[in-house]
Amino acid sequence: MSEKPKNRYFVPKNGRNRTQPVSARAAWLLVLSCFCVLLLLCWSAGYGLSARPGPREISKSASTEPNAAREQVSAQPNAVKTACELIYQGKFDAAAELIEQPDRTVYPQLGRLAEIIQQYKGISEQRQSAREAAYREQLVELQKRQAQGKTTDVNDTNDVNDVNDIVNVLSVITKASEFASQEQREHLFSDAFVKETIQKAIDKAADFELRGKWLDAYINCYSWLKAIDPNNKAYSDYGEQLLDKAIIVVSLQDSPCESREERYKGIEKGMFVWAIEVLSGHYVRRTIDYSHMAKQAVRQCKLLAEVMPTAFAPKPQGQSSESSPSSPDANQLTAWSAGLAAISDQIEQSSTGLKKDELIDVFEKVLALNKATLELSQSALVAQFTEAALSALDPYTVMVWPRQVQEFEKSMTNEFTGIGIEISKPKGLLTVASLLQDTPAYKAGLDAGDVIVAVDGVQTKDMTLLCAVRKIIGPAATKVTLTIKRPGQEKTRDIVITRGKITVPTLRGWNRTETGKWLYMIDEPNRIGYVRVTGFSSETASELEEVLKNLEGQGLQALILDLRFNTGGLLTSAIEVSDKFLKEGTIVTTRSPYAGVLTYAPAHEKDTHPNYPMVILINYSSASASEIVAGALADKTHNRAVLVGDRTHGKGSVQGITHYPRGAAQLKYTMAHYHLPSDQRVKTREETEKQGKKDWGIGPDVEIELTSDELKKMLDIQRGNDVLVQAGRDPNSASLKRHSAQETVAADPQLAVGMLIIKTKLIEAQLAALAAGQTRPVSAKAL
């Protein structure tokens, strides 16, 4: 990997939806909550004209009688254009009313718009019918669970107080709540059995906590309670505290992938002091609440005292906690807690709030207190204190500790040294989900569907995905031995693979060919292209340029850009991608209270692609760089694209990276906010929620929010189309299921509506072409 400059500015990926080591807490949160996320995925939810157009015509009369066509268009009222504008806003009913009056035999475009509106209504009715059916199904299941709880049959194995049964009922309540109307939801939550189950979950969580099983309390109880009632602050706060405690426990223990000593190696107390100095001069807010930072850090230290007596065995006589984690004796814990209480009082007594130096003084006092009481590893305590203090600022200001730097760099560049596979863990088995083309794994004969039983002799059964990744990747030219079991074969076998440089492509199509190449033309008759952008790396813009030129060479008429689940990447990449579709004006500006405008990115006319219709698909996981691209192209200044989907994540900020001068650590800190071309600032979710509002991020023009069932179906089909297998694999095998474009669109309401918007755009372009006297307007044969 080439040497990086000391300071870089970028829009990073959102650590909530991707695996990236932005902090010890984030990494452990991923490890701790992966099972919970998998469990909840199914229940909680919520993707101009061609440069070289082909000789395709709307109708014979349009091409042979251009004068008559122009006269007809000039006489036509603005009904078509107005109806199109209503459709772009998601106002299909209003558009339907508008086009009822004019004579569709005179204005054929109105007839095609009516067909599009009818298709939209069909999609909406089908979705509503599915929601109602799903709600009824959950009510039946809930009644069944209630009946099982009342049974007097001594042979009945159901125990309503058993955690598994509580989870099963909570999952039914969660799904019923998702599909219910507001009136149905109120009725559901007033049900005695539902109330009883929720109380049992709260009681069960308390029991788990008494036994030091904080993760169990979260996964089995509070994760479900939060899903059932996401607006309940008590559930959210208590769930967060449970996770904090669970993270502390795991962070102080050895794991199959690293020892505690390895985890905290290289961490110095000077790193915290350095970080505070950097933030005092460069953080996005002029006034930093150092008191709040101190309170959060001391709170974390208090949680340490709560966790250690239950989570660790008593410390042997004369042994220091520096060598291995253990529970301090009662006197040590009492002294630690008393010292923290005194420090807390000092913080509260400050009438004007703490200054920077006073926060550092609190840090020094906590370290001294630890030395006199707990004797916990200083590097571990520095990490705990620092992470908690920085969390008081925003979710994106974090320390990247020495152990995490390599993983962090990989997440930013999409480059690493490994073997080139995507892995998952269905049914607890570490499995190759897909291959990357022309990589060591592909060349060695590894295939999608292979179960990885062991890595270098270490069994993977109890290994987390993060741990498995760390064991499989490694320095270039080194070897890793994977013990695999292929579906349909009884015996395992070893495959030795030499690691190499892997560059993960950030563009995908809607499907693959038999040879593994991506297909980007999702609608051949209408020449509609589809490009899914999974991240914004230094190579994304050049990859996109190649794809667009190829599509335009095939007569591209319209483009769908899918930014769903794209959590971000490089700011420069987002600017370069946006610039491909804009001739002039501003793309984005970033502003800091210290330096004013840090970035002003104008569009350039050179190399701008044709002004064909565009739709951008967005969702709740579209963040950071994705929000910049979507916001710039849909901004009223440009009106280059229509946004379809649901509201984006709401990151709204730009981070900088600076390196600790005496070690490998890095500080990633929020340094600016970004503004759209119209100068509107993209609001962050955190600050917007504090104001009781919900207008964070970028809102869609046409809102289509997927249910959990729809999301699962869409992702299942997408994964099936994405899988790359070895050449020669039977394409009709049960383990390899490809789907047609029609099936892919039908399984994805956001994409389906996006296609309708695109076809509406094509009708509008057709009308404009006729008005301009073009004899070869945009094709609309299959609209």
Place the predicted regions along the sequence by residue.
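Hydrophobic/aromatic side-chain positions at a characteristic register within alpha-helices
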Residues: 84-87, 146, 161, 209
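PDZ domains, with a preference for the canonical peptide-binding region formed by the helix
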Residues: 446-484, 545-549, 573, 651-657
